Amino acid sequence: MERTDVVVIGAGVIGLAIARALAQKGREVIILEAENAIGTMTSARNSGVIHAGIYYRPGSLKARLCVAGRDKLYAYAKERGIPHKKCGKLIVSTDETQIEKLTQWHAIAMQNGVTGIRRVTPEEARKLEPEVSCVAALHVPISGIIDVHSYLLTLLGDAEAANAILALRAPVLKGEVDGDGFVLDVGGETPTRLACRTLINAAGLGAQEFAKKLTGLNPATVPPLVLAKGSYFSLSGKTPFQMLIYPLPVLGSSGLHASCDLGGQARFGPDVEWIDHIDYRVDPARSVLFEESVRRYWPNLPNRALQPDYAGIRPKTARASPHDSDFIIQTSREHNVPGLINLYGIESPGLTASLALAEEVMARLA
C-alpha cells in the first residue's frame, strides 16, 4: 500500500489551489482526479468572472473570501502572466420596482468592503455602455475576467514545482478512517490503495458522494447536494459591450448576464434549472427565455442572434440565492474526524475566492 502525507481529491481550481498551498509549505501532496484532465467540471463551465464581492451576506465565507481572493487573484495573475482584464461591471435595474433592491445591493457591497462602486444614472450608464437600457445602475470597476484554463495550469505548475503529484483518471471509489489517517481505494487503469494522514475532499459535484463512501465519517454531517444547471448562449456577431452587464440577482443565480471572454466572444447566462442528475446539454428552446431576458437591458439584441453554447452545474446545498447560501468548510470541529476537510457548496464565487479559500483551509489544518 502506497503512503503519502496529504491527498487532495479533485483537480479543479479549489483542489489545485489547496494542493499548491500545501505543497509550498513542504507537505507531500498527491492530487487525485477522476477525469482525464484538470478542471473539466465546475471550474471549466462558468463565466470566468473575477467577482467584486457584492452578492454575499456580510460576514459570510463567500463575502470574506471573495473580497480577499479577488485581490490575491489579480495580483497572482499579474505576477504570473495569466491573461485577465479588469473590465468592470454594470448592475442594472430595468424598471422602477427594482431600484430599492439595487440600493440594498449597494449597501451590502459597502458592508463587504467593495471599493470603487458607485450609483449611476441611466445617462451615465449609457455613456459607459451606449447599448444598455436601464433606469438605474451600479458601476463596479473592480470586476473582471480571467483565462480559467491558464489559471488552472499555473496552479498545477506551482504545485508540481513544489513536488506535488497529479494522478488523472484516478477516481476514489471509497475510503475509511484508519487510526491516525485514512486509507483510500483508488480506481482507474492501475487500481491501488493509498494511505494518507490528511485528506482534503475538494471533489465539487462529487464531494457528497465521496463523503458518504468514507467509512468512519458520520453521514449525518453530509449536507444535501442540490444541482443548479446554468445554460449559456453565445452571441453571433460582435459584442456591443466592453463591460460585464448584470441584471439583479434571482433565486439560485447572480442573473442572466452578458459577459465576454478574452478572445472577444460574447455570451449570456447562466439561467437556473433545478435538475436531479448531471446533464450538460443545452436546450435550444431556452433561447426564447434568453432573448426575452437579455432584451430587458439590451433592446437592440438582433433576432436569432443567440446560439446554444455550453452549460455548467453549480454544486449547491440548498435552493437558495447567492446571498442566502454559503461555502461549507467542515473540519473535525464539525465531523469529529481529525485530518479531514470536506468542502461543500463551493459554487460562485469559488473561482474568485480560490486562493483565499486555500489559505483558509491551511489555517484550519494548523
Give the location of each predicted region.
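Dinucleotide-binding Rossmann-like beta1-alpha1 core, especially the glycine-rich loop
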Residues: 48-124, 134, 255-256
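N-terminal Rossmann-like FAD-binding beta1-loop-alpha1 element of flavoenzymes
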Residues: 4-31
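C-terminal lid/capping helical subdomain adjacent to the catalytic/cofactor pocket in oxidative enzymes
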Residues: 3, 25, 44, 324-366
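Short beta-strand to alpha-helix junction loop
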Residues: 58-68, 92-101, 139-157, 281-286, ...
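Active-site substrate-recognition segment that forms the wall
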Residues: 21, 50, 82-85, 193-198, ...
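Helix-loop-beta segment of a Rossmann-like dinucleotide-binding subdomain
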Residues: 56, 83-93, 116, 122-162, ...
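Glycine-rich FAD pyrophosphate-binding loop
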Residues: 23-45
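Helical element adjacent to the flavin cofactor pocket in flavoenzyme catalytic cores
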Residues: 138-198, 355, 364
